[in-house]
Amino acid sequence: MASLNQEQLKILEQTRQRLLHLTQSLGSLSNSINQSDPLPPWSSLQSQATIISNNLLSISHLLTEHQELLSSIVAYPTPNFPGRTESTILHQLMRTKLEPRVEEWVARGRNVARHNTASSQIRAQQGAAAEGETVRLSVDELLDLWHWAPIAANMEARRRDWGGDYTLEEKEMGVKNVITGLKRQLDEGDEEDEEEEEEEEDMQGEEMEVVVGAHTKAGGGSGVEFDIARGSSHIPSKPVAPGMPLDDIFRFMMTGAPPRPR
């Protein structure tokens, strides 16, 4: 390939600048999340995400517009290139294949784009054929949906913590090292059972009157008198002392003076 002209060099420089802006935006978002405690406000994160989205859109338009030029450019070192001191950059420039992780991302993105393009064409054809009717998924699309949905739902469920006292990260670090876990929701039914048991005990402890005998009234009067005896398990309640006035309580709290006898 012949040497690049000024217009082609300008396109390469624009691509480099926009990739640099994207790298800086991603680094800024990563630092704000990792170093801020507490996390930045939602408006700040949303603003940074919007900037990253605009950078990605700009790079996508630039790569699509100059796809022919960028795909035909070949990098090669000149004799003056410092290959020994800049070997890392040289290997990156001479690399002909993407990294495995990046290659997987590209394949996934192309698959999604291909599927969306095919679905859009099918919907457009169906809309042109029957305008106003509800667009339904095809058999292949339904099969793909039913194959994808349970796997995606299972993966999403595993990434979340469904009702434990501690999060997955806290369990991995060790529960003993956790200062405060998630608050457990107590069952109100336990409190109601305890109140019912206390009421039954109080009823059993209440005094019971028992008729133990009967005799005629003293003095020769007409009628019958009954002898009433209390249950053997009855325990007389202790008299309750009167409550302390609030004035004495506040005076003791402020000055330490003991309450006045009553």
Curated annotation (Swiss-Prot):
Q: Which GO terms describe its biological process?
A: regulation of transcription by RNA polymerase II
Q: Where is the composition biased (Acidic residues)?
A: 188-206
**Gene Ontology cellular-component annotations:** core mediator complex; mediator complex
Origin: domain of life = Eukaryota
- Which residue stretches, if any, does this entry annotate as coiled coil? 168-211
GO terms for MF? RNA polymerase II cis-regulatory region sequence-specific DNA binding; transcription coregulator activity
Keyword Nucleus part of the UniProt annotation: yes
Q: Which Pfam families match?
A: Med8
Localized where? Nucleus
Which keywords does this chain's UniProt record carry? Activator, Coiled coil, Nucleus, Transcription, Transcription regulation
User: Looking at the record, which segments are called Disordered?
Assistant: 183-206
TM ranges: none
Relate the assembly described in the record. Answer: Component of the Mediator complex.
Report the PANTHER family cross-referenced here: MEDIATOR OF RNA POLYMERASE II TRANSCRIPTION SUBUNIT 8 (PTHR13074:SF9)
Briefly, what is this protein's role? Component of the Mediator complex, a coactivator involved in the regulated transcription of nearly all RNA polymerase II-dependent genes. Mediator functions as a bridge to convey information from gene-specific regulatory proteins to the basal RNA polymerase II transcription machinery. Mediator is recruited to promoters by direct interactions with regulatory proteins and serves as a scaffold for the assembly of a functional preinitiation complex with RNA polymerase II and the general transcription factors.
| Family statement drawn from the similarity comment of this UniProt entry | Belongs to the Mediator complex subunit 8 family.
Return the protein name: Mediator of RNA polymerase II transcription subunit 8
Origin species, per record, is: Coccidioides immitis (strain RS)
Q: Which gene encodes it?
A: MED8
